[in-house]
Amino acid sequence: MQPRRQRLPAPWSGPRGPRPTAPLLALLLLLAPVAAPAGSGDPDDPGQPQDAGVPRRLLQQAARAALHFFNFRSGSPSALRVLAEVQEGRAWINPKEGCKVHVVFSTERYNPESLLQEGEGRLGKCSARVFFKNQKPRPTINVTCTRLIEKKKRQQEDYLLYKQMKQLKNPLEIVSIPDNHGHIDPSLRLIWDLAFLGSSYVMWEMTTQVSHYYLAQLTSVRQWKTNDDTIDFDYTVLLHELSTQEIIPCRIHLVWYPGKPLKVKYHCQELQTPEEASGTEEGSAVVPTELSNF
């Protein structure tokens, strides 16, 4: 039996009143007149440049999509980044093709409890080109980031986390991370970070120009014993989609070993309006871990 789509609990519901559920209303919200600095037009792009200013929500949407892609491609729980601030950007709109966004933004380490060496800053900087194909998911992304954790240090941190997982006497079977009070036990932080790593692929694949997801909760985790050295586990996540305030259950299977390609398979209930029939989305991926921007 497939998990049923769930409404967001009251604490997450925001201000009272009707919420936009249709993609058109979500697009209008995204394009509200909150502007960031705009650049000049792209001479090679047939679309129309946004001369008067680019909606900040669109730049943030592009930056978050780029980070989902970047985190998944990194294959490293120690390298996870989140958006700190959008610094500048520009966009071109082609009604037939979609929207192309160039955005520059700063990032910070996803796990604020990670130990920092003296002189090591939390912030990094990224530049991304993101192409939203109208309302289709899985935007095309080219992203480069700098001022990140050194490769050697990242590998050391990943291996320490890996050893902690392998030293467990019994495979994990966990329910609800974080708990109902929003707390993540320090002993479960690695599981959460690995789940975030795999979920980044799912969130990138499901993202559109108006839909944005973040990881709300793990509702189940099951680690499997393997005959090789990999970490292999299944987990169910609840993804929060902001424009519709929907919660989407996804079952994800992840195989991880430090320095090796990350393997992800998933099966999600499709985001839909109440008038639409039920559906599912699924996919899988294996990615390289050697990236030019590390």
Curated annotation (Swiss-Prot):
Its main location: membrane. One of its GO terms (molecular function) is metalloendopeptidase inhibitor activity. It is found in: Membrane; Secreted. Residues 43-294 are cytoplasmic. Residues 38-153, 173-276 form the Cystatin LXN-type domain. The chain crosses the membrane at residues 21-42. Inhibitor of the cytoplasmic carboxypeptidase AGBL2, may regulate the alpha-tubulin tyrosination cycle. Belongs to the protease inhibitor I47 (latexin) family. Interacts with AGBL2, KIF11 and MAPRE1. This is Retinoic acid receptor responder protein 1. The gene is RARRES1.
